[in-house]
Amino acid sequence: MAAARLCLSLLLLSTCVALLLQPLLGAQGAPLEPVYPGDNATPEQMAQYAADLRRYINMLTRPRYGKRHKEDTLAFSEWGSPHAAVPRELSPLDL
């Protein structure tokens, strides 16, 4: 019983530590917008802000491949075989 309680305590502790060590994210996993350093900022601070802002914009506008809804795409089995013969009507030249 003591071993089970110890394992449960370690699991709870490791879960709490893992949650606390996660990077700070905004709502629904979006990164936080960088804070403007002010009008009297040094050129180094402005360069760092510009780099952070560029990273922030790139993160928000990156393409998300493979994140489509199931209704928007057809299943491969619905396409049919690419080698299947397509029935066609006979033309007067075929007769």
Swiss-Prot record:
Propeptide regions on this chain: 89-95
A GO CC term assigned to this protein in UniProt: cytoplasm
Similarity comment text for this entry: Belongs to the NPY family.
Tyrosine amide: residues carrying this PTM: Y65
MF term (GO), any: neuropeptide Y receptor binding
Transmembrane regions listed in the UniProt entry: none
Secretion signal span: 1-29
Keywords annotated in UniProt: Amidation, Cleavage on pair of basic residues, Hormone, Pharmaceutical, Secreted, Signal
UniProt subcellular location: Secreted
Organism annotation: Homo sapiens (Human)
PANTHER family with a match to the protein in the record: NEUROPEPTIDE Y/PANCREATIC HORMONE/PEPTIDE YY, PANCREATIC POLYPEPTIDE PROHORMONE
Induction: Released in circulation upon food intake. Also up-regulated by exercise.
Protein name: Pancreatic polypeptide prohormone
Gene3D superfamilies reported for this sequence: 6.10.250.900
GO annotation (BP), single: protein secretion
Acetylation found in the keyword field: no
InterPro entries: Pancreatic_hormone-like (IPR001955), Pancreatic_hormone-like_CS (IPR020392)
Recorded coiled-coil stretches: none
Superkingdom of source: Eukaryota
